[in-house]
Amino acid sequence: MPLENLEEEGLPKNPDLRIAQLRFLLSLPEHRGDAAVRDELMAAVRDNNMAPYYEALCKSLDWQIDVDLLNKMKKANEDELKRLDEELEDAEKNLGESEIRDAMMAKAEYLCRIGDKEGALTAFRKTYDKTVALGHRLDIVFYLLRIGLFYMDNDLITRNTEKAKSLIEEGGDWDRRNRLKVYQGLYCVAIRDFKQAAELFLDTVSTFTSYELMDYKTFVTYTVYVSMIALERPDLREKVIKGAEILEVLHSLPAVRQYLFSLYECRYSVFFQSLAVVEQEMKKDWLFAPHYRYYVREMRIHAYSQLLESYRSLTLGYMAEAFGVGVEFIDQELSRFIAAGRLHCKIDKVNEIVETNRPDSKNWQYQETIKKGDLLLNRVQKLSRVINM
């Protein structure tokens, strides 16, 4: 994928997910008074006459409504909807099915653009019923998926993902098949299914055209983030470290490149510094923010495990130096993760030595079998109680 701007290949940015990101930023205490973010968001609201969205925005962010602005936008909405209704009425009286469908689509797109969620959903569903061409039906489903992502409506996203899959199986083209993977991957990030997100994103790195969701740099950044937490080291090397498309973009993303390569090259103190930067970025990202604590914790465990795999034992001082932290910090971290069963090692407090005690594969399989057997037994017992009732 070349780096030049190819946004014309994407679908319309309607709704524009950048608006959802700006709204999220303004909900954070540290950005609540950020004039630049507020100005950018309000410029989008005014430019698109987003009266319904503006009312909901003021309510959620506890803003004072600008009554004059709201009335002006409502008037613009009424005038445009009247014009669109007249065009639809004319098409129904004088034109064919294709023109009727186009008029219905224009109204649905306008309702979507101004932030009238329920009105847009109703209009798109009516248009869908009037649409025969498979490609056009899929484009409507992509609209519904974008609305779902914009408002983070889980039910809307899951229902329309299944609908899109079904339509693609009927004969969807290559471009729409790949586009759906990006939509699914983005939703997987939102619900913390990083493994599935990595698989979907890596499948579409070389074919990405979903600029209606994000630019290519953001897509590559997300791909690196989810791949690092989801992939084993050999897969990370083959699919990311050696990925030509990813490497090309990483030249213009030095912080992301350092984050990726510092872990792979075992430069742990640099990795910890990069992880701290990633943590701050994730806090400000509307998709990653709910998961940043989990992500950072898992990546620390990942780094500790990677170092420990190379040794039978090593001193706490060596580990602390490797990660660029104090001995007390590393002692507390390891103790916490060992107690939780996340690290296979033990700490000799007297000699300040960390000794690895990785379970062999047969022992691990035995423990897994026992665990799964207990779960199955519990489910059978619950089922038998229900049946007996």
UniProtKB/Swiss-Prot annotation:
Family: Belongs to the proteasome subunit S10 family.
Organism: Homo sapiens
Protein encoded by which gene: PSMD6
UniProt keyword GTP-binding present: no
Pfam families assigned: PCI, RPN7, RPN7_PSMD6_C
GO biological process terms, semicolon-separated: proteasome-mediated ubiquitin-dependent protein catabolic process
A GO term from the CC aspect: ficolin-1-rich granule lumen
Name this polypeptide is given: 26S proteasome non-ATPase regulatory subunit 6
Domain PCI: 193-361
Domain of life: Eukaryota
Keywords from the UniProt entry: Proteasome
PROSITE patterns: PCI
Quaternary state and interactors: Component of the 19S proteasome regulatory particle complex. The 26S proteasome consists of a 20S core particle (CP) and two 19S regulatory subunits (RP). The regulatory particle is made of a lid composed of 9 subunits including PSMD6, a base containing 6 ATPases and few additional components.
Role, per record: Component of the 26S proteasome, a multiprotein complex involved in the ATP-dependent degradation of ubiquitinated proteins. This complex plays a key role in the maintenance of protein homeostasis by removing misfolded or damaged proteins, which could impair cellular functions, and by removing proteins whose functions are no longer required. Therefore, the proteasome participates in numerous cellular processes, including cell cycle progression, apoptosis, or DNA damage repair.
